[in-house]
């Protein structure tokens, strides 16, 4: 080794002998609500479409308590694994206030958190994979997205809470909502977040539809 330099003065000294010290880990993409069904392993034949339909039948019963609980459990597990920054893409909104609940949980735990206000606007009646009744109106998505950014998004260095905008997928969101979300994100100065070409099902869907 090199020259031994005495450590600077500190209020607290942690003996990390025998430990691996790393920077805080970053989780760039997750769906925390899916913690509620992670023990289930149905056979969906390797098809994303079948996967959607299998799990949407359960996720359509989500409520704020389920979102709050899954967020708390998921973020606590991440913190225990060494993660200090996480993004979560929540695109199911059966009622208003779910992103707000996530922000409160993240602040309580102390993780740096980017809440992605996801959306689904293309349901099965229009050829999408989103079950009828789970799609949101286009205008409502835009209004809620702007509200969340203005209420929660922090812009200062080392901000602990940020909002990003993210239609879920072209299989469950219209081109119009993609375009308008991108324009709104640019106007508000926030990030975009989505899924692209997850599997051959999505590629076929996009080629056939667009």
Placement of each model-derived feature along the sequence:
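Histidine-rich, glycine-flanked metal-binding segment
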Residues: 1-22, 165
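Short, ordered loop/turn segments at secondary-structure junctions
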Residues: 3, 37, 91, 118-119, ...
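N-terminal capping/lid subdomain adjacent to the active-site entrance of alpha/beta enzymes
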Residues: 21-25, 30-32, 58, 79, ...
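Proline-centered helix-kink/hinge sites
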Residues: 23, 60-64, 167
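Histidine-centered catalytic micro-motifs
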Residues: 23-35, 191-200
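Alpha-helical scaffold segments that flank or form the walls of functional sites
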Residues: 38-112, 142-158
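Metal-coordinating catalytic core of metallo-dependent amide/deamination hydrolases
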Residues: 97-210
């Amino acid at each position: 080794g090199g020259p031994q330099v005495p450590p600077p003065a500190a209020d607290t000294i942690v003996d990390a002998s025998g430990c691996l010290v790393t920077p805080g880990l970053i989780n760039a993409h997750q769906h925390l609500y899916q913690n509620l069904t992670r023990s289930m392993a149905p056979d969906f034949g390797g098809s994303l479409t079948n996967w959607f339909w299998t799990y949407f039948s359960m996720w359509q019963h989500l409520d704020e308590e389920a979102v709050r609980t899954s967020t708390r459990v998921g973020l606590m597990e991440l913190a225990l694994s060494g993660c200090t920054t996480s993004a979560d893409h929540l695109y199911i909104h059966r009622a208003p206030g779910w992103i707000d609940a996530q922000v409160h949980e993240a602040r309580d735990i102390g993780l740096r958190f980017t809440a992605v206000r996801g959306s689904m606007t293309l349901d099965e009646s229009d050829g999408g994979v989103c079950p009828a009744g789970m799609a949101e109106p286009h205008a409502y998505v835009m209004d809620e997205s702007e509200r969340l950014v203005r209420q929660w998004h922090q812009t200062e260095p080392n901000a602990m809470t940020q909002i990003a905008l993210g239609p879920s997928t072209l299989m469950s969101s219209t081109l119009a909502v993609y375009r308008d979300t991108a324009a709104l994100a640019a106007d508000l100065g926030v990030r975009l977040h989505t899924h692209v070409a997850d599997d051959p099902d999505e590629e076929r869907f996009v080629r056939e539809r667009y």
